[in-house]
From Swiss-Prot:
<keyword id="KW-0066">ATP synthesis</keyword>
<dbReference type="InterPro" id="IPR036771">
    <property type="entry name" value="ATPsynth_dsu/esu_N"/>
</dbReference>
<keyword id="KW-0472">Membrane</keyword>
<keyword id="KW-1003">Cell membrane</keyword>
<keyword id="KW-0813">Transport</keyword>
<comment type="subunit">
    <text>F-type ATPases have 2 components, CF(1) - the catalytic core - and CF(0) - the membrane proton channel. CF(1) has five subunits: alpha(3), beta(3), gamma(1), delta(1), epsilon(1). CF(0) has three main subunits: a, b and c.</text>
</comment>
<dbReference type="Pfam" id="PF02823">
    <property type="entry name" value="ATP-synt_DE_N"/>
</dbReference>
<protein>
    <recommendedName>
        <fullName>ATP synthase epsilon chain</fullName>
    </recommendedName>
</protein>
<keyword id="KW-0406">Ion transport</keyword>
<dbReference type="GO" id="GO:0005524">
    <property type="term" value="F:ATP binding"/>
</dbReference>
<dbReference type="GO" id="GO:0005886">
    <property type="term" value="C:plasma membrane"/>
</dbReference>
<dbReference type="GO" id="GO:0045259">
    <property type="term" value="C:proton-transporting ATP synthase complex"/>
</dbReference>
<dbReference type="GO" id="GO:0046933">
    <property type="term" value="F:proton-transporting ATP synthase activity, rotational mechanism"/>
</dbReference>
<keyword id="KW-0139">CF(1)</keyword>
<keyword id="KW-0997">Cell inner membrane</keyword>
<dbReference type="InterPro" id="IPR020546">
    <property type="entry name" value="ATP_synth_F1_dsu/esu_N"/>
</dbReference>
<comment type="function">
    <text>Produces ATP from ADP in the presence of a proton gradient across the membrane.</text>
</comment>
Length: 136
């Protein structure tokens, strides 16, 4: 049996997961990151994407996150998400509404270049996430 560690997934709305797990795959800003027990201490930002959690029981569950931070220690991982839901509760239609809202905000045109770049990056990440959900 693989070594296990404590994993917490927290959003401002609620605590989604606080369990013993064997593996977590997170959408770090610089690419997908697999966290296992005894991982080197790391802190990273999270982009919109899927978090895949493999519980000590062997069960796997996915969550959709919309940005945040992950604090990784050898004994545990805490993911503080700006917003998060179970992937079972996130439909492609709901995500499409977020994409449409991001497009509308970009089209308003009253943005400084730096803010516009962030909006475009966010739209790109949401679009990629939508493609992942539709394919799943």
């Amino acid at each position: 049996m693989a070594d296990s560690f404590k994993f917490d997934l927290v959003s401002p709305e609620r605590l989604l997961v606080s369990e013993t797990v064997t593996e977590v795959v997170i959408p770090a800003t610089l690419g997908e990151m697999t966290v296992l027990a005894n991982h080197a201490p790391t802190m990273t930002t999270i982009k919109p994407g899927l978090v895949t959690v493999k519980f000590a029981s062997g069960e796997t569950h996915k969550y959709v996150v919309f940005g945040g931070f992950a604090d990784i220690l050898p004994t545990g991982c805490t993911l503080l998400a700006e917003s998060a839901v179970s992937a079972d509760d996130m439909s492609p239609d709901t995500l499409q509404k977020r994409i449409d809202a991001a497009k509308a905000e970009i089209q308003e045109g009253n943005h400084h270049h730096e803010h516009l770049t962030k909006l475009e990056k966010h739209l790109y990440e949401l679009t990629n996430l939508h493609e992942v959900l539709v394919a799943a």
